[in-house]
């Protein structure tokens, strides 16, 4: 195994070759984690944006199962599933299918278009330039984070994130956007393991087999993660499980990992030295 690969695996915490029995154990472990954290913080609810993708569908169902468990114990708790489209989402029916599977305590739709377009206009007025599609995509992700914290802020709920090992290693999230959350119940799982957990939870193939997409770009709606990364999730997952992958793919993945280190840390201070290495 490559030296950096071993280091990354220790950091990400992925267990190789997960079986269905182990997946069921992981479901239970993560439901209990959510319950324990809600009780420890005194919070009475959770908020999560639901896109219809694999990760938010899995995290959403785990949240609802945790909330159901606490309610059965007499501790009134709720899960608010938030739809956060920019205008009209091209795969809206997938999001609705995810909501039917999750069965959240309540759901609401917060369309971010007006906020993002207003920022777009203000940006042009301030800089004299048109915001790039990529930069605007990050604005969308951060607007969604703001919306979720606004929904959570009134009742004092916690915001749930969907980051997992296959996204963390690549830094494939927006800093202070979808990377902003109070708890990450999918940490330590890779993409195929997220799919496996959804399967053992009874999700339809339409949900667990959906091609992952951040869907942030106006110019390329629905562009897949794999196309954007130039790597496949099977390659990333194999690497995270300690398996050998194509040399060029491994080198590219490690380069992306090193380049995105700043996303996996708190803001750098004068006392930090990791960035010097």
Residue ranges and their predicted role:
Residues 2-170:
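ATP-dependent adenylation/nucleotidyltransferase module used to activate substrates
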Residues 25, 29-33, 189-200, 252:
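A non-catalytic, amphipathic alpha-helix used as a structural packing/dimerization or gating element
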Residues 28-31, 96, 195, 233, ...:
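Generic alpha-helical structural signal
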Residues 78, 104, 136, 144, ...:
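Catalytic subdomain that performs nucleotidyl-dependent activation
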Residues 213-251, 258:
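Long, well-ordered amphipathic alpha-helical subdomains in the mid-to-C-terminal portions
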Residues 243-277:
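Intrinsic disorder and flexible/low-complexity segments
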């Amino acid at each position: 195994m490559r030296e950096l690969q071993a280091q990354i695996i220790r950091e990400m915490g992925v267990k190789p070759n997960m079986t269905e029995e182990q997946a069921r154990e992981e479901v239970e472990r993560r439901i209990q984690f959510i319950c324990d954290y809600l009780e420890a913080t005194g919070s009475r609810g959770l908020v999560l944006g639901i896109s219809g993708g694999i990760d938010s569908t899995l995290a959403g169902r785990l949240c609802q199962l945790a909330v159901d468990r606490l309610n059965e114990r007499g501790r009134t708790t709720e899960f608010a599933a938030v739809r956060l489209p920019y205008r009209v989402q091209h795969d809206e029916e997938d999001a609705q299918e995810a909501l039917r599977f999750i069965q959240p305590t309540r759901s609401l739709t917060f369309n971010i278009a007006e906020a993002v377009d207003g920022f777009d206009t203000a940006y042009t007025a301030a800089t004299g330039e048109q915001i790039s599609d990529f930069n605007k995509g990050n604005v969308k992700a951060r607007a969604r984070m703001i919306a979720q914290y606004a929904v959570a802020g009134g009742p004092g709920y916690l915001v749930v994130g969907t980051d997992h090992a296959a996204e963390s290693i690549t830094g494939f999230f927006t800093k202070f956007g979808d990377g902003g959350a109070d708890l990450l119940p999918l940490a330590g799982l890779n993409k195929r393991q997220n799919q496996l957990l959804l399967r053992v939870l009874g999700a339809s193939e339409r949900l667990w087999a959906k091609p992952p997409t951040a869907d942030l770009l106006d110019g390329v709606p629905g562009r897949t993660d794999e196309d954007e990364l130039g790597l496949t999730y099977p390659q990333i997952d194999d690497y995270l499980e300690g398996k050998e992958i194509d040399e060029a793919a491994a080198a590219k993945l490690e380069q992306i990992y090193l380049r995105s280190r700043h996303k996996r840390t708190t803001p750098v201070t004068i006392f930090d030295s990791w960035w010097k290495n």
